[in-house]
Design a protein with these regions (language model features):
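Active-site HxH/HxHxD metal-binding segment of metal-dependent hydrolases
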Residues: 26-27, 47-126
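Conserved beta-strand hairpin/beta-sheet module of binuclear metal-dependent hydrolase folds
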Residues: 3-58, 139-156
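Metallo-beta-lactamase
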Residues: 39-42, 47-49, 117, 124-219
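Residue-level signal for inorganic ion chemistry
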Residues: 12, 56, 191, 216, ...
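Histidine-centered divalent metal-coordination motifs
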Residues: 70-76, 133, 191, 254
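C-terminal regulatory/interaction regions
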Residues: 218-276
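A short catalytic or substrate-binding loop motif that flags glycine-/basic-rich loops and adjacent residues
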Residues: 23-26, 112, 131-134, 276
Length: 276
């Protein structure tokens, strides 16, 4: 996946990869161009990197109909306001409270609701509210192809980090299962290559999250009342310790879910299991 190179996925969809590779972004953020001519939706324009913005403008020949974002993390939406102004098109998406992880430059002209339709010449995107990774996250189903643009709801090659309070493990698992209610064949993730089997991927991710939740409970019982630093070593013993600071965020999301279900309790940042 080479930054700046347009990759044609179908008659309706092209992809550009932003030059922002890293542990959390994989090969870089995927920007998708849906449609052709004057009816091009720019989906997840990515970070405000000049070379990437120019590549997007060149790929759509300076013409677009809207800029659409899955969510407002800094690797997905900062280029939106720049492109919207330059191409004189509206921004579409949703905002959330500032939790120090959001792109505050994204102020949509059209604020989405679940099941809203975005339509162009020969294509229709159905907005699917998928809170979890963050509470303003949306996926977009290209109805003509059964292809869902998943942002950070589903990534190829890794699981996504859930960061409370904007992120919720309980909501994330429910939102994964929600995709199974739609006629989805494949996943176009925010990072990485196309995933051809949406149902199989969703089922795998749900199993993984529930397995990790089981390890959280086992860890609580093994080490007794403990803080996040003590727990992460046990719960994420299969993860590179260099990533444990990120892992603690998802683990906290698991703990909050367990607390809401009456299986864990916390006092002064010390967590413990509740019941048998």
């Amino acid at each position: 996946m080479t930054p700046g190179v347009v990759h044609t996925l179908s008659d309706r969809v092209r992809r550009l990869v932003a030059p922002n590779p890293g542990p959390m972004t994989g090969p870089g953020t995927n920007t998708y161009l849906i449609g052709s001519g004057n009816n091009v939706a720019i989906l997840d324009p990515g970070p405000a990197i000049d070379s990437h913005i120019e590549a997007i403008v060149d790929a759509c020949a300076g013409k677009a109909s809207q800029v659409v974002c899955t969510h407002t993390h800094p690797d997905h939406s900062p280029a939106a306001a720049i492109l919207a102004q330059r191409l004189n098109v509206p921004m579409i998406g949703a905002v959330t409270a500032d939790d120090r992880h959001q792109d505050l430059t994204f102020q949509p002209d059209i604020d989405l609701s679940d099941a809203d339709l975005i339509e162009g010449d020969g294509w229709t995107l159905c907005a699917i509210a998928t809170p979890g990774h963050v509470d303003n996250h949306y996926c977009y189903l290209l109805q003509e192809e059964g292809l869902v643009f998943a942002g950070d709801h589903i990534m190829n090659g890794s699981t996504v980090v859930i960061v409370p309070p904007g992120g919720s493990m309980q909501a994330y698992i429910a939102s994964l299962r929600k995709l199974l209610d739609y006629d989805v064949a494949a996943v176009a993730p925010g990072h990485g290559e196309i995933i051809p089997d949406c149902r199989g991927e969703v089922e795998k991710l749900v199993r993984h999250r529930l397995m990790r939740e089981h390890k959280v409970m086992s860890g609580l019982r093994k080490v007794g009342p403990a803080n996040l630093d003590a727990l992460v070593v046990v719960v994420y013993d299969d993860v590179d310790p260099a990533l444990h600071e990120w892992a603690k965020l998802s683990m906290l999301a698991h703990l909050i879910k367990l607390q809401s279900e009456g299986s864990a309790a916390v006092q002064q940042d010390i967590w413990q299991a509740v019941g048998s």
